[in-house]
Curated annotation (Swiss-Prot):
Residues 26-87, 119-126, 160-200 form a propeptide. InterPro entries: Glucagon_GIP_secretin_VIP, VIP/GHRH-like. Keywords: Amidation, Cleavage on pair of basic residues, Hormone, Secreted, Signal. Residues 1-25 form the signal peptide. This is VIP peptides. Gene3D superfamilies: 6.10.250.590. It is found in: Secreted. GO terms for biological process: adenylate cyclase-activating G protein-coupled receptor signaling pathway; epinephrine secretion; mRNA stabilization; positive regulation of epinephrine secretion; prolactin secretion; regulation of protein localization. GO terms for cellular component: extracellular region; neuron projection. The modification Threonine amide is found at T156.
Length: 200
């Protein structure tokens, strides 16, 4: 009888081990796995990565491991490979978008620096131009003041000490002395101008 009582116990133990074996192959409850890829719905892989190309001729450990796995665990191995590919793809997308963002920021900084340089360089020609205008106006003013001062000294009969140098005056007197002698001391400028013929 003991033999007959052990038979249902053995059968229950066999069924329980089979269920546990199958339950171990299922994902844990509440785990976030992507939808189960079927034969027709496999995710396409456009091109092999550099590491895949480097190991192309040799069988990788993952291929050897996949061949030794039982059929019910191969699905999870494929699923982990798909997740790895998706992670690499997400990393690639992030890297691409991030590099574009950095390039845009670099271009923006460069344009701001150009605009800043242009604004600051526009100030300097204006400043140089205003400095040149001031210098030009100041030199004209100085010339006008010198001419006025000279005319006042000539008209009042006062000359500077440089012009009153006797050696210089004798040399000029010999050059400017007319061949005939006339006295111009008592003649005014108005009288001289009135005797000049002016054609109007």
């Amino acid at each position: 009888m003991e033999h007959r009582g052990a038979s249902p116990l053995l059968l229950a133990l066999a069924l329980l081990s089979a269920l546990c074996w199958r339950a171990r192959a299922l994902p844990p409850r509440g785990a976030a796995f992507p939808a189960v890829p079927r034969l027709g719905n496999r995710l396409p892989f456009d091109a092999a990565s550099e590491s895949d190309r480097a190991h192309g001729s040799l069988k990788s450990e993952s291929d050897i491991l996949q061949n030794t796995l039982p059929e019910n665990e191969k699905f999870y191995f494929d699923l982990s490979r798909i997740i790895d590919r998706n992670a690499r793809h997400a990393d690639g997308i992030f890297t691409s978008v991030y590099s574009h963002l950095l390039a845009k920021l670099a271009v923006k900084r460069y344009l701001h620096s150009l605009i800043r340089k242009r604004v600051s360089s526009q100030d300097s020609p204006v400043k140089r131009h205003s400095d040149a205008v001031f210098t030009d106006n100041y030199s004209r003013f100085r010339k006008q003041m010198a001419v006025k001062k000279y005319l006042n000294s000539v008209l009042t009969g006062k000359r500077s000490q440089e012009e009153l140098n006797p050696a210089k005056l004798r040399g000029e007197a010999e050059i400017l002395e007319p061949s005939f002698s006339e006295n111009y001391d008592d003649v005014s400028v108005d009288e001289l101008l009135s005797h000049l013929p002016l054609d109007l």
